[in-house]
């Protein structure tokens, strides 16, 4: 969208706080997959922020933690010529949609509010297509977390693990005490969440980048990838037989209620602990996945804006983008979601120890070059290759496929275009 006189007037309203409109409020339809308890609380805050700017929220929620169902729904709407105003889309998929010529330019608000100075350069780059902003970033999630119930550890006589060897010692003790060692949901994206943390722990950030971002064939077929699958194969023996099709938040609930000891999951899991009234350090532990303390797999949620013919809809999109980037919204949304603010200038006072650790580690890994995009969270590679890779990992998790066969299949899947 070009910066017109109407846009200038709109930005003046944004700068002034955009008081609620007395007449029938304009509406913005938002497609998203934030449907769990903690996520729903976060969405409610975005609705409030948007309503405060005089825009009504039209909810288009599609359940499914990986976003696959939402992606299918979005494609159908775009093909029909009636896309939503905004959709929860992230990573390389933003560029893929840009190539289709269906995205709205939101530079009018991004330039006025100086997003380039508020966002880390790596994040700003992801939000742009051909140099212009087309998406508003909501948060930063760390994916390589291990969530632990300390009461389960105590009952089993186990210690919180920091290495993979320590993890297996703890898992054995939890299993011997009659509890489930690893809470997990048997879905491809959850399988891949475990896989990528194992790969990062086994090979480090350089190996991770070569294998799972650059899709380098030597890295994909080498000994570190074989060790990754060997380790993953051992982990799956600690998962209960009823895991198939289990939603991630139900697996988190198993850790919350003491049915299971540990879960590999991004820090959106913390939103579930918070919703259950649990406190970090006492009721649960947030630990970097074994062997990954000096690395950080990131997942950035973002709202991608689609071209709308009506000027009113275009104005509503800019107001939505402005609301998302406001420090007030960034604070309250991320407190509910379990993530951390993506922009500078947000108070840290209300964030807990897990979030503060995530903030510190984001900064240190960014400086050290060990900050890497999450494969499972759609941040690392294009959708075609990602889907093929995740299928291989899921087959390995749900069959007697050997590690070597998995390595061979993974290398082939990585060539998918």
Where are these regions (language model features)?
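Short, solvent-exposed loop/beta-turn-alpha elements that line the ligand-binding surface or hinge
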Residues: 107-121, 125, 186, 202-227, ...
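A structural signal for short loop-to-beta-strand junctions that line the ligand-binding cleft
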Residues: 76-77, 83-85, 115-151, 180-181, ...
């Amino acid at each position: 969208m070009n910066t017109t006189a109407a846009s200038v007037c709109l930005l003046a309203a944004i700068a002034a706080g955009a008081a609620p409109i007395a007449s029938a409020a304009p509406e913005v339809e938002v497609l998203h997959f934030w449907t769990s308890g903690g996520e729903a609380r976060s969405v409610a805050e975005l609705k409030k922020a948007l309503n405060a700017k005089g825009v009504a929220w039209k909810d288009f929620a599609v359940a499914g933690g990986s976003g696959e169902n939402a992606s299918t729904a979005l494609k159908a709407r775009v093909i029909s010529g009636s896309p939503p105003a905004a959709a929860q889309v992230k990573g390389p998929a933003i560029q893929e949609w840009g190539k289709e010529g269906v995205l709205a330019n939101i530079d009018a608000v991004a330039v006025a509010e100086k997003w380039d100075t508020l966002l880390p350069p790596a994040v700003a780059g992801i939000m742009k297509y051909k140099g212009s902003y087309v998406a508003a970033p909501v948060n930063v999630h760390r994916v390589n977390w291990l969530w632990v119930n300390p009461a389960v550890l105590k009952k089993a006589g186990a210690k919180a693990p920091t290495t993979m060897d320590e993890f297996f010692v703890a898992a054995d003790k939890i299993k011997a005490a009659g509890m489930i060692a690893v809470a997990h949901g048997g879905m491809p994206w959850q399988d891949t969440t475990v896989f990528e943390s194992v790969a990062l722990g086994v090979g480090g950030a350089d190996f991770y980048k070569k294998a799972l971002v650059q899709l380098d064939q030597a890295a994909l077929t080498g000994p570190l990838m074989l060790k990754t699958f060997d380790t993953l194969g051992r982990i799956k023996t600690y998962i209960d037989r009823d895991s198939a099709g289990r939603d991630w938040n139900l697996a988190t609930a198993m850790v919350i209620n003491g049915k299971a000891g540990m879960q590999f999951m991004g820090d959106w899991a913390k939103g579930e602990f918070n919703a259950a009234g649990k406190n970090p350090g006492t009721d649960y532990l947030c630990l970097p996945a074994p062997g990954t303390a000096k690395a950080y797999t990131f997942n950035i949620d973002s709202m991608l804006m689609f071209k709308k013919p009506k000027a009113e809809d275009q104005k509503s999109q800019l107001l939505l983008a402005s609301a998302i980037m406001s420090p007030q919204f960034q604070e309250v949304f991320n407190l509910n979601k379990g993530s951390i603010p993506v922009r500078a200038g947000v108070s840290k006072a209300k964030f807990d120890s897990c979030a503060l650790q995530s903030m510190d580690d984001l900064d240190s890994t960014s400086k050290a070059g060990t900050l890497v995009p999450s494969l499972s969270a759609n941040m690392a590679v294009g959708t075609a290759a990602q889907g093929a890779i995740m299928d291989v990992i899921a087959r390995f998790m749900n069959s007697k496929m050997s590690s070597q066969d998995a390595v061979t299949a993974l290398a082939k899947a990585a060539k998918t275009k």
